[in-house]
Amino acid sequence: MAAVFCVYNEEEYLEVAVRAILPAVEQVILCLGLSPYTAYRAEGSLEPYPPDRTEKIVDRLAAEFPGKIQVIKGNWPSQMEHREAGLKRCLELGMDYHFLVDGDEVYREDHLRHIRKTIEQHPETGTFIIKCHTFWRSFHYRIPPEILTWRPRRIFKLTRNRRILGIPFPHKLKFLGANDLNGIGTIYEFPPAEAAFYHFSYARSADRLKEKLATFPHAHQILGGWYERVWRAWPQQREMENIHPTDPPKFPRAVRQSLDDLPPVMKTHPYYGMDIIV
């Protein structure tokens, strides 16, 4: 199994995400974008968002784990094309499973052990859904998986052939969406209590959040005034509901929870002690 990261400007969380998952997989593939996606940039937007320290982090990790970390660098217009580059390398390496991980997704060791065990017990499964805790403006606040409607597909079995009337035919694996591969087999969803990931997508500084909103695939769908009305206003209105930037009910509310369940590696992160990340 290979963990495949497709990243650009992920210096805040990439290193902890990679180190957390390294022991659970045979290979880590880091697909580093050297510039932001152009397909989602708003018309007339010339904001450059130059590279941060992500490339240095990638190079350092690859040097530290030369037999385990593969690096691909390039410029991809869209997230789909970026994903396809990672899939291609995964297939070239002869991997049986593709573990999709974004640069702000961190796993716990006990959850990863359970994931590996479950995969071994379910060879008939082609797609594994792993829900997440999505953090909001702080490590203290999150949209827990129990109220989060998103059901992210994260692990795909790489079946190269499919049988029709008992005859094997080549099956071309490809991404159908940013988080969906056309794998063959059943779908298994992990109960969040058994396995979930910690998604720090909205636990960012104001500048980083603006960059995310300008360059991610749903940039054109962001509701007008959301940044001022929701993001900036939330610290003074922490009971606010329906806070997602493109489809408000997707984030019903951010709930304050204990930090006790966080992956231990997060306890050394610079944001750990902050009530609100600024």
Which role fits each region the language model picked out?
Residues 1-23, 30:
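N-proximal low-complexity "stem/linker" segments adjacent to membrane-targeting elements
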Residues 63, 91-92, 120:
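Residue-level signal for alpha-helix termini/capping positions
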Residues 19-72:
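Acidic donor-binding segment of Leloir-type glycosyltransferases
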Residues 86, 94-108:
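Short beta-strand-to-loop acidic/aromatic patch adjacent to the donor-nucleotide binding site
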Residues 74-90:
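Glycine-rich, basic loop-to-helix element that forms the pyrophosphate-binding segment
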Residues 79-84, 106-278:
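Catalytic-site signature of metal-activated, phosphate-bearing donor transferases
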